């Protein structure tokens, strides 16, 4: 069955035009939290494409540029005459004002960044139920000098005369603050007002409707052909395995490549869980010796990643040829991957988007072009939290759904320097203790990631009246919403003490434990 004959996928009710904002993805997530489907598209989208999608509302995102710059990104100005409600956020509002005959200038007082109370000047559907003098998050250096004809000022701050504007007749609205960020007290109220009161969207984007719509599409796309899935045991590939199994049953084969860098007990758990408990066909490939031999003498982290990725491809090729033939390859690509792959760079000469190379997915490590698979990517329009919801609805247990993120190269990049079996055994035991104690303390679901890192140095210690010279272990525990930024977790000292005592007493070759209290930025979550 050809791809073109497939039933049309659901169109977004709210379309988000991206002008390079760091928050565009967050806007989409916030709208979906209201049970309304939204997608992020390029600011260069054509009027014809918009009409084909027929959205209920459009949001113009913020962005790092100034609208009065020569090559500032724009959108087709006819968008404002479509009769579709539009909300401009920050740069999006300034662009709307400029395109409709108003004027934008550099801030006359000072740039406004951070929290600021807004003063509501008049009633508006956009600010309905928003409390006067509530805190909103500002991040702008330019301001509106003169509004276009038909617009009214509906809110201001101490430093911004036009904090929110409206043209009720044409249903055009703008806010200088960012309602999508958590710091804006009534931000979700503003978003809900635009989505429901102004755009009249239906709250029909739910986990149940997604599953109901997706399973028939998978069956239609695949037909009676065979599908191969590289299973890692993470929430993405696990959810995908359950979804495909529900849709096509025995046509699915999962391949689990054990490269030797998994956490303690995970290979056994995954095989027992998928193959024996839920009867999902999983081919176990023991490639531990191959991978560890390739890393002998390798200390540079990017080189380790590259070697692991290349070896994964080789193993995947060999085993897929042995088990096949397969006509389809299933990938757990998520919507953030799609957004990132589409590119967000602005050409300084033309002001248009620059296409960027599509990144390889971590589950398959960048497959070679001569593998003649057709792709099945049913999760490609979902965010991580939505994938977890789908997994829960399909029956995945909490121990997988709430599993902490784990890097594709596994423990190989949590061992700084050269990787060998002795270090892997040491780190596995230490890492298991960290997670065990965090779970016992009831903190596991409150922490984004909790793990151990093995350093490539040795330290002096004293144990049993004898001098020791052994490795130190670093504890890394962070709290985050999406992994883009993170704070180190303020774990009670008693729990840290218990973890440290267990590690130095139960793990051979470790005599010291330290706690990493670096946030991201400036640090990263992983050490390599």
UniProtKB/Swiss-Prot annotation:
Keyword Magnesium among record annotations: no
Residues in GMPS ATP-PPase domain copies: 205-403
Pathway(s) this gene product operates in, as recorded in its UniProt entry: Purine metabolism; GMP biosynthesis; GMP from XMP (L-Gln route): step 1/1
E.C. no: 6.3.5.2
Reaction(s) the record says it catalyses: XMP + L-glutamine + ATP + H2O = GMP + L-glutamate + AMP + diphosphate + 2 H(+)
GO MF annotation: an example: GMP synthase activity
Residues that coordinate or bind ATP: 232-238
Parts forming coiled coils: none
One GO location term (cellular component): cytosol
Residues covered by the Glutamine amidotransferase type-1 domain: 13-204
Active site: 90, 178, 180
InterPro entries registered for this protein in UniProt: Class_I_gatase-like, GATASE, GMP_synth_C, GMP_synth_GATase, GMP_synthase, GMPS_ATP_PPase_dom, NAD/GMP_synthase, Rossmann-like_a/b/a_fold
PROSITE patterns cross-referenced by the UniProt entry: GATASE_TYPE_1, GMPS_ATP_PPASE
Alphabetized UniProt keyword annotations: ATP-binding, Glutamine amidotransferase, GMP biosynthesis, Ligase, Nucleotide-binding, Purine biosynthesis
Domain of life, source organism: Bacteria
Pfam family, one: NAD_synthase
UniProt key word GTP-binding: no
Function: Catalyzes the synthesis of GMP from XMP.
Subunit structure: Homodimer.
Name by which UniProt lists this protein: GMP synthase [glutamine-hydrolyzing]
Annotated organism of origin: Prochlorococcus marinus (strain MIT 9215)
